[in-house]
Amino acid sequence: MKCIVLAAGYGTRMQGLLGDVPKALVPLGRQVLLDALMQRLALLDLPTYLVSNSRYYDQFQAWQAKARWPIDIIDDGSTEPANRLGAVGDLAFAIDRLDLNDDLLLLAAD
């Protein structure tokens, strides 16, 4: 089994509150929301992949460099809400890009 974490949304409804920060990287106490998810996922010891969009990809890479969670981050290529793939599209993208042929645990990053 492998895990895919979907984090390629643009948070348009939260934009005024978050600025240009993905919802998954919003502070939650001394960590960010995604850290809380990864702490729980670490107990399962599954290969884990996060699907980001192009706008937030670098922010997720910077988070990973500091947090050092074992997760592969892939960019779905979308650059704005108008060309986003959507949840099902991002899932299909990840399965195809990573050539996955296994059971999957699918999670939303937020």
What positions do the PLM features span?
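Glycine/threonine-rich flexible loop motifs
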Residues: 15-17
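Short alpha-helical oligomerization interface
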Residues: 19-24
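Conserved N-terminal catalytic core of the sugar/cofactor nucleotidyltransferase
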Residues: 2-5, 13, 27, 31-108
